[in-house]
């Protein structure tokens, strides 16, 4: 009976070397194993069976040690899924970067076009104002030339009038036997002339009171003629002084002229120069502002390009990912 049990136990150990059973037997405490064995079956186990059991148990224990030290192998489908998700994420990020950079580039192009249009409009306005200024200057020169010609013509007329009046200073009345009229003899004539050549009052003292209204009319005509001659001489002297100085406006200016043409030209020139300087300053300020904004946009665009380049450089290739996953396997997430 004991022999049959021993042989049967030996056959079970040899014919069914289950790794789980062997591991459980070797990892279980020794007391339990000894309790299960019968004292009569232990001395009857063959030496060859014990050697086989020991070798098989050592191999199984070595295999179990290897399995416990190394992590479980990863599934190829899980690795491919992870690579696919990583590639999709990086592709979406690159597409976003490219779209953002494209929008920024379009904004920069629009800003540059607006700046070119603004500068072109300003240049056109400056050309128009310069043309208007040239036309105005030509008109002023024509007006000055016409005014000088008028002054020369008036001066010639006044000289001719003064020469003619010098020859006819004395006016004699008609002498006839039938008429008893005669020219009155002016004893004293006192006149006061204002600053502008206007007559204030006349005082006539006649030697004889005979003659009546005719004598009084002749006296008034004589006084008016002398007044006109005095005013004419004063105007000629002032015109000659103005022509001699050149840049000074003539003293006697007609009411319809208003402002001296030289002074008008000087003021117009100063006004145009001031406006042009202000417009140039405004254009320079606008140009500096546009250049600054353009520089900021270009800096931002270059930053986006550098970021995209760095990200594309850091993206590993599929072969590198596969090789690294095979050499350094990592456990699946539970």
UniProtKB/Swiss-Prot annotation:
Main location: cytoplasm
InterPro entries in the cross-refs: POLAR-like
Region described as Disordered: 53-74
Taxonomic superkingdom: Eukaryota
One GO process term, biological-process aspect: asymmetric cell division
Composition bias, Basic and acidic residues: 53-63
Keyword tags: Coiled coil, Cytoplasm
Presence of keyword Cytoplasm: yes
Annotated localization: Cytoplasm; Cytoplasm, Cell cortex
Coiled coil stretches, renumbered: 273-300
Gene Ontology cellular component terms for the protein in this record: cell cortex
Disruption outcome: Decreased accumulation of ASK7/BIN2 at the plasma membrane and impaired polarization of ASK7/BIN2 in asymmetric cell division (ACD) precursors thus leading to its nuclear localization in the meristemoids.
PANTHER family recorded: EMB|CAB62613.1, PROTEIN POLAR-LIKE 1
Function: Acts as a stomatal lineage scaffold which regulates subcellular localization and transient polarization of kinases (e.g. ASK7/BIN2 and ASK3/SK12) involved in asymmetric cell division (ACD) in a BASL-dependent manner.
Protein name: Protein POLAR-like 1
Lineage: Eukaryota, Viridiplantae, Streptophyta, Embryophyta, Tracheophyta
């Amino acid at each position: 009976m004991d022999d049959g049990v021993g042989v049967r136990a030996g056959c079970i150990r040899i014919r069914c070397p289950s790794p789980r059973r062997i591991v459980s037997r070797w990892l279980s405490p020794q007391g339990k194993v000894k309790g299960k064995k019968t004292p009569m079956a232990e001395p009857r186990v063959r030496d060859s069976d014990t050697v086989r059991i020991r070798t098989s148990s050592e191999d199984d224990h070595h295999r179990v040690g290897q399995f416990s030290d190394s992590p479980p192998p990863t599934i190829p489908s899980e690795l491919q899924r992870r690579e696919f998700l990583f590639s999709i994420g990086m592709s979406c990020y690159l597409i976003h970067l490219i779209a953002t950079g494209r929008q920024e580039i379009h904004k920069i192009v629009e800003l540059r076009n607006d700046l070119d249009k603004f500068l072109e409009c300003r240049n056109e306005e400056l050309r128009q104002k310069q043309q208007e200024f040239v036309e105005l200057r030509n008109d002023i020169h024509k007006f000055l030339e016409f005014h000088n010609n008028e002054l020369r013509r008036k001066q010639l007329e006044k000289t001719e009038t003064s020469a003619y009046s010098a020859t006819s200073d004395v006016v004699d009345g008609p002498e006839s036997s039938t008429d008893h009229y005669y020219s009155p003899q002016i004893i004293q004539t006192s006149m006061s002339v204002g600053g502008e050549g206007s007559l204030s009052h006349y005082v006539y003292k006649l030697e004889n009171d005979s003659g009546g209204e005719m004598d009084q009319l002749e006296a008034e005509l004589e006084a008016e003629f002398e007044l006109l001659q005095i005013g004419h001489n004063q105007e000629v002297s002032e015109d000659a002084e103005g022509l001699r100085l050149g840049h000074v406006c003539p003293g006697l200016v007609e009411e319809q002229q208003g402002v001296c043409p030289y002074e008008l030209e000087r003021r117009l020139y100063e006004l145009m120069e001031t406006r042009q300087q202000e417009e140039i300053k405004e254009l320079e300020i606008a140009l500096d502002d546009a250049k600054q904004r353009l520089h900021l946009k270009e800096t931002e665009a270059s930053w986006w390009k550098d970021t995209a380049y760095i990200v594309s450089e850091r993206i590993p290739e599929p072969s590198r990912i596969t090789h690294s996953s095979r050499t350094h396997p990592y456990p699946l997430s539970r």
